[in-house]
Curated annotation (Swiss-Prot):
Domain of life: Bacteria
Protein known as: Acetyl-coenzyme A carboxylase carboxyl transferase subunit alpha
Organism placement in taxonomy: Bacteria, Pseudomonadati, Pseudomonadota, Gammaproteobacteria, Lysobacterales
Enzyme Commission (EC) number: 2.1.3.15
GO BP of this protein: fatty acid biosynthetic process; malonyl-CoA biosynthetic process
Chief site of localization: cytoplasm
GO molecular function term, any single one: ATP binding
GO CC annotations, alphabetized: acetyl-CoA carboxylase complex
Pathway it works in: Lipid metabolism; malonyl-CoA biosynthesis; malonyl-CoA from acetyl-CoA: step 1/1
Similarity section: Belongs to the AccA family.
């Protein structure tokens, strides 16, 4: 199977392969297969729509982890007129699992922070598979305070399986670094927009996920634990990850219904990786619209709304 297709996309892969075969067969001057190709493309569109109309939580999880899915730097390239990356936490090291810096979107200055994964073995190792260490979160905090100092809106892009659980990370205060970011983000005197672009894994995601708006791409996930981890704990069997994904309620649709996500951004048919340019333009339009709304709110009112928003999480009514 083509590695760019997931298992549930096999019918799509088969139709794409047939189209390619016909294209190759049409190289001769006397061969015209356009009618057959058009028919197959129509069938492909219908079949793709059918498959993506009712995805399971596990299938959404697979899409969120797709190796070709756009990452933070890909979106920065698409939405920013210019961007200057800043490095280091000024205390220990520069964690490549988190990127951030100063940018302009349609001339508007912003600070952007996001998780960053790698594409190949070398960059995956360099980025630690998108799992930040304490110095990554402290770098993020440094940039947050920089944004506050210069009164620049903050945009964060969330895409991590979780914070790195290694011994060194724990020794350097992983839990403190995450907790500190939660505290500081709750009190930043600037507009903060957080967007889940892929995986939103537990505290590792939440450490750059406290803000005035939480956006989520259609096939992103946001959860306290991975489906595999949940299955291992509850049923002692990682093979039950599909069941765990359903129970966790980690999809954008479920989280929007619970009020944990403000807006779900529709992805191109087949996922963001099928048309990264289109996805970037959609994301840019939504971010600019949200910034326009937030920048009209006085700082005191913004902080009060953020406080009330955070206090509302977990509230329920008895029956």
């Amino acid at each position: 199977m083509n590695p760019n297709y997931l298992d549930f996309e096999q019918p799509i892969a088969d139709l794409e392969a047939k189209i390619q075969e016909l294209r190759k067969a049409s190289t001769g001057p006397a061969v015209n297969v356009e009618t057959e190709v058009r028919a197959l493309r129509d069938k492909l569109r219908v079949r793709t729509a059918q498959i993506f109309r009712d995805l399971s939580a596990w299938q959404v999880s697979q899409l969120a982890r797709h190796p070709q899915r756009p990452y933070t730097l890909d979106y920065i390239d698409t939405i920013c007129d210019e961007f200057q990356e800043l490095a280091g936490d000024r205390a220990y090291a520069d964690d490549k699992a988190i990127v951030g810096g100063l940018g302009r979107i349609d001339g508007r200055p912003v600070v952007i922070i996001g998780h960053q994964k790698g594409r190949d073995t070398k960059t995956k190792v360099a980025r630690n598979f998108g799992m930040p260490r304490p110095e990554g979160y402290r770098k993020a905090l440094r940039l947050m305070k920089l944004a506050e100092r210069f009164r620049l809106p903050l945009l964060t892009f969330i895409d991590t399986p979780g914070a790195y659980p290694g011994i060194g990370a724990e020794e350097r205060g992983q839990s403190e670094a995450i907790a500190r970011n939660l505290l500081e983000m709750a009190e930043l005197k600037i507009p903060v927009i957080c967007t889940v672009i892929g995986e939103g894994g537990s505290g590792g995601a939440l450490a750059i996920g406290v803000g005035d708006r939480t956006l989520m791409l259609e096939y992103g996930t946001y959860s306290v634990i991975s489906p595999e981890g949940c299955a291992s704990i509850l049923w002692k069997d990682a093979a039950k990850a599909k069941d765990a994904a359903e129970q966790l309620g980690l999809t954008a649709k479920r989280l929007k219904g619970l009020g944990l996500v403000d807006k779900v951004i529709r992805e191109p048919t087949g996922g963001a990786h099928r048309n990264p340019e289109q996805m970037g333009k959609r994301l840019k339009a939504v971010l600019l619209n949200e910034l326009d709304a937030l920048e009209k709110i006085p700082v005191d009112a913004l902080l009060q709304q953020r406080y009330e928003r955070l206090r509302s999480y977990g509230a329920y009514e008895g029956h």
